Amino acid sequence: MSATQFDEARRVSTSVLTSSERRCLLWLASRLPRWINSDHLTMLALLAMLMTGVSYSLARSHPLALVLAVVWLAVNWFGDSLDGTLARVRGHQRPRYGFYVDHVVDCFGVLFLLAGLALSGYMSPLVAMGLLVAYFMLSIEVYLATYCLTVFRLSFWGFGPTELRLVLAIGTLALLFDPTVDLVGQRYRLFDVGGLAATAGLAITLVVAVIRNVRALYQAEPLPALAKAGR
């Protein structure tokens, strides 16, 4: 199978930190030892998400493990964000392999993360499950749109993976001080509230993306005009 047969999708990222992050990643990629390649970074990202989930689960009995979760989130950012940049800087792009492996790893990573949160006591298992379903549904939509429209969207509403990691890290550190939040006179788990808000945001994003992409595809491939009556 020739790589020339594959048309790589146009990457679109409008997140708040895109330009700053790109400069940082290029700086890091140009300074990594030659023996480190993009596959090493991808596997590091997967291991980091596994350890993030383990850290959350340990935090049920050892709250300071939340600090470890934040550290592993940072390691995940390093591996997940840098693997593609390193491949492009060195001219070692593998468009099909990279796209497939990167996003399979992402799916397992989110599963590890939310499983850890479900076991942590800081997020209800039902909330974690709902958030996982919403994430997977939006991911499926993004992958289908990438195939059909050859546009790969890396962010929505100014948020991409990096911004989401930052929000999660800040929320995780906040758990050390108070794992609950007061809403309308009732106390709720902070990560239950955050998880429900994230699920709602993903669901709204999914609906908006589906409507936009169905419209674009219909305009590109409309039904043939009906023959006039009597002809």
PLM segments and residue spans:
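Hydrophobic alpha-helical transmembrane segments
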Residues: 1-71, 115-231
